[in-house]
Amino acid sequence: MARIAGVNIPDNKHAVISLTYIFGVGKTTAQKLCDATGVKPDAKVKDLSDEQLEALRTEVGKFTVEGDLRREVQMNIKRLKDLGCFRGLRHRHGLPVRGQRTKTNARTRKGPRKPIRK
């Protein structure tokens, strides 16, 4: 297994699909990475040369991925909570943030139903 950005990417899959195993790299970004490094998107990772893998590593290094991206997202949420703005309050209370209805749906965000006490 090749290791890029601290992630073991599968050898037996195409390069584009394997790159999406990295947090922060989707299909479009993976395609751009392959184009920038000259790697054929349909080439298997096990068939790539060491130079191509190294080129992919340096190109991925230019993006914010994995731990840095996770930390950045968490810091953004923490900033909203500290500001006390509406979105921060929704995060703090564990409710949907982007205006979804909560009367009937939002079970994932709200958690399991609580029984009615008498």
UniProtKB/Swiss-Prot annotation:
Ranges for region Disordered: 94-118
A GO biological process held by the record: translation
Keyword Ribosomal protein among UniProt keywords: yes
Keyword RNA-binding: yes
Molecular function terms, GO-annotated: rRNA binding; structural constituent of ribosome; tRNA binding
Keywords tagged on the record: Ribonucleoprotein, Ribosomal protein, RNA-binding, rRNA-binding, tRNA-binding
Pfam families (alphabetical): Ribosomal_S13
GO cellular component, as recorded: cytosol; small ribosomal subunit
Role, per record: Located at the top of the head of the 30S subunit, it contacts several helices of the 16S rRNA. In the 70S ribosome it contacts the 23S rRNA (bridge B1a) and protein L5 of the 50S subunit (bridge B1b), connecting the 2 subunits; these bridges are implicated in subunit movement. Contacts the tRNAs in the A and P-sites.
Complex and partners: Part of the 30S ribosomal subunit. Forms a loose heterodimer with protein S19. Forms two bridges to the 50S subunit in the 70S ribosome.
Family label: Belongs to the universal ribosomal protein uS13 family.
Protein name stated in the entry: Small ribosomal subunit protein uS13
